[in-house]
Amino acid sequence: MIFIDACFKKETPYTPIWMMRQAGRYLSEYQESRKKAGSFLELCKNSDLATEVTLQPVEILGVDAAILFSDILVVPLEMGLDLEFIPKKGPHFLETITDLKSVDSLKVGAYKRLNYVYDTISQTRQKLSKDKALIGFCGSPWTLATYMIESEGSKSYAKSKKMLYSEPEVLHTLLEKLSAELIEYLSLQIQAGVNAVMIFDSWANALEKEAYLKFSWDYLKKISKELKKRYARIPVILFPKGVGAYLDSIDGEFDVFGVDWGTPLEMAKKILGDKYVLQGNLEPTRLYDKNALEEGVEKILKIMGNKGHIFNLGHGMLPDLPRENAKYLVQLVHNKTKH
């Protein structure tokens, strides 16, 4: 698989490409599948439809990897927190984590209750072309913790940070508990058939450097180290969003570092490029315009060359992006990097 070879810095015939949120609302096929499911959460839980949605971007766009269709919040959901998705607003937990008692009341073994995810993986792997990789994923302990404490996405993360500074032991207990679940969750995804795993630290940028390293990065390192120990041949991709200013402190046993669009790629290459493969980092809104798209691709390929790079966006696909431009992006990257 070209994608897997690229994760390990091996020579590839061209630069592989996939896109974060490549299965999404910009595809009418996705909209139809979601309609059949009835809701976003039911779509995640319906393995037949989730498989359909996982495969759509590979079939329509020609990307080099499929990423499992699911949601990072299924883990806290199966730990006992009721979750709903509010239209035009997003995820919302009906109860929150406020103290040590509420952390202790979380159910352990959530990874044993996520069979609908593993079924989607095995179905997808059976149907996916052998030369295409399947990526599994989870959210980082810190990002999951913020949702569990705030009840939803936040602009200030005030409750999470209040706990971090005034009751750090409570937050560490929660992060430890989540890390243990995530190690087993990703292990079972690998056993079900994924070829690589990715950890999304979507709210990494909520923390100053010292707090980030202690309350997020240390846990990411712990998870990736254990996974590499268990499954050395499975690439681990980490995507901490918005930590461009902290790159000099990034270390650990993983293979690919996801670069968001706000971080200069030249800088990431200079600091991390010798040690890790870089993934990213096209600004997603360039997909609205073909000229802007071409210019962005040219710039990235000039910096990265043919090795040590997986092409991706620096954030997820937006719901109203023209699908023909997404398809054009895949062709553009393949054609420009063939050698």
UniProtKB/Swiss-Prot annotation:
It catalyses: uroporphyrinogen III + 4 H(+) = coproporphyrinogen III + 4 CO2. It is found in: Cytoplasm. Pathway: Porphyrin-containing compound metabolism; protoporphyrin-IX biosynthesis; coproporphyrinogen-III from 5-aminolevulinate: step 4/4. The record marks 71 as: Transition state stabilizer. InterPro entries: UROD/MetE-like_sf, Uroporphyrinogen_deCO2ase_HemE, Uroporphyrinogen_deCOase. Keywords: Cytoplasm, Decarboxylase, Lyase, Porphyrin biosynthesis. Its EC number is 4.1.1.37. GO terms for cellular component: cytosol. It is an enzyme of class 4 (lyase). Pfam families: URO-D. It comes from the Bacteria. GO terms for biological process: protoporphyrinogen IX biosynthetic process from glutamate. Substrate binds at residues 21-25, 71, 147, 202, 315. The keyword NAD does not apply. Its main location: cytoplasm. PROSITE patterns: UROD_1. One of its GO terms (molecular function) is uroporphyrinogen decarboxylase activity. Catalyzes the decarboxylation of four acetate groups of uroporphyrinogen-III to yield coproporphyrinogen-III. PANTHER family: METHYLTETRAHYDROFOLATE:HOMOCYSTEINE METHYLTRANSFERASE RELATED (PTHR21091), UROPORPHYRINOGEN DECARBOXYLASE (PTHR21091:SF169). Homodimer. Belongs to the uroporphyrinogen decarboxylase family. This is Uroporphyrinogen decarboxylase. It comes from Helicobacter acinonychis (strain Sheeba).
